[in-house]
């Protein structure tokens, strides 16, 4: 099983618990979600609790993360969208921390689970719907009626807009899930090549050099992907929130 590249994604029960026929077991996925929240919160607290006039490197990282998301949200949803800053910043930090923790050997990558990424995506779209109807009432439905569309094409365009909106949770969740899943499987496969070829002695070690170089390169790429996927999720969240704030703006 250790050579199976998909074995790292198995969800195992740590504390079995069933109530009324519903499984509430505490799993390795649950453990690392708690660890992700703790790591992100702990990092931000430790780096900002004793802020100095001259920031330390870690304090600078925290402040840059804050400004990065604030600027992204301001550009994506305008000044009125800044009320969603805590939500977008929390999502970004959770996904980024989860992705980075998943790079540690023997750790579990929670963002490689479609149920986790889908829950995050549904939370985002649910927030868009709730705020959109709360703020604009039925005027929120203008989101599905683009300006300047000829009357004859309007029914078709509205149908396309509705389908596009309903597909957002799927595309948002699958993008993150698929990238993390594929990246970790690829790393596992190349690492397996290195281990297998090294077992053949000197000749095998020579043959393992290329897979080893590829593994190191892919590891560096995965760290980049870990940030990019958190960034993409945050950018799309800002774009979707803009639809809730300005439903007639497209």
Curated annotation (Swiss-Prot):
The chain crosses the membrane at residues 26-46, 84-104, 114-134, 143-163, 193-213, 216-236. It is a multi-pass membrane protein. Its main location: membrane. The keyword Transport applies. InterPro entries: ATP_synth_F0_asu, ATP_synth_F0_asu_AS, ATP_synth_F0_asu_bact/mt, F0_ATP_A_sf. Keywords: ATP synthesis, Cell inner membrane, Cell membrane, CF(0), Hydrogen ion transport, Ion transport, Membrane, Transmembrane, Transmembrane helix, Transport. It is found in: Cell inner membrane. One of its GO terms (molecular function) is proton-transporting ATP synthase activity, rotational mechanism. GO terms for cellular component: plasma membrane; proton-transporting ATP synthase complex. Pfam families: ATP-synt_A (PF00119). The keyword Transport applies. Key component of the proton channel; it plays a direct role in the translocation of protons across the membrane. PANTHER family: ATP SYNTHASE SUBUNIT A. F-type ATPases have 2 components, CF(1) - the catalytic core - and CF(0) - the membrane proton channel. CF(1) has five subunits: alpha(3), beta(3), gamma(1), delta(1), epsilon(1). CF(0) has three main subunits: a(1), b(2) and c(9-12). The alpha and beta chains form an alternating ring which encloses part of the gamma chain. CF(1) is attached to CF(0) by a central stalk formed by the gamma and epsilon chains, while a peripheral stalk is formed by the delta and b chains. Belongs to the ATPase A chain family. This is ATP synthase subunit a.
